[in-house]
Amino acid sequence: LTLRTSIVGPELKANGEGLFHWFMHQEKQCLGYKTAIWGGVTTLELAKVVDYVIQNPITGLVQVSNGEGINKFDLLQLFKEIWHSGIEIVPVDKNGIDKSIARSQRLAYEVPSYKQMFIDLKQWMDGHISLYAANYPMEQGR
């Protein structure tokens, strides 16, 4: 089985390189590209998919996505909303690239909406603060 996707989520290393890590370390404002489209899953959602395919084996190439693209501006807005960030996200209409991923119909697992994935991720992080507190500004119930 090959799972093809793109992931976003917290990193355990201090000098993380991903979009979530980058956003969580911004101080005042950042750019949000309205024409750059992403279509993956959170790291937590990928773990759920891996657990699912272990229990429900399939073979071949499976693309893991909810089948909907989201632009980076809206993605950062979800981070801001769910993690209660005061960062100003400035919309930018350039850098048009579509990295959305079509959902494989063979995978019976239903990937939720982006908002739900990030709500779930926030709850997971809040429940496992000791894993993330060193690298991310976190408060219980925030």
Across the structure, where does each feature detected by a protein language model lie?
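Hydrophobic/aromatic beta-strand patches that form the interior of the parallel beta-sheet core
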Residues: L1-L3, V62, P112
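NAD(P)-dependent short-chain dehydrogenase/reductase
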Residues: L1-W38, L44-E45
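A short acidic, often aromatic-flanked loop/helix-cap motif at beta-alpha or helix-coil junctions
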Residues: P10, G39-G40, K94-K99
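Short aromatic-enriched loop/helix-cap "lid" or pocket-rim segments at secondary-structure transitions
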Residues: K13-E17, L75-Q77, I101-R103
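Residue-level signal for the nucleotide or nucleotide-sugar donor/cofactor binding architecture
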Residues: W38-V41, I70, P112
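Mid/C-terminal beta-alpha module of Rossmann-like enzyme folds, strongest
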Residues: A47-K99, I129-G141
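Amphipathic terminal alpha-helices
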Residues: P112-R142
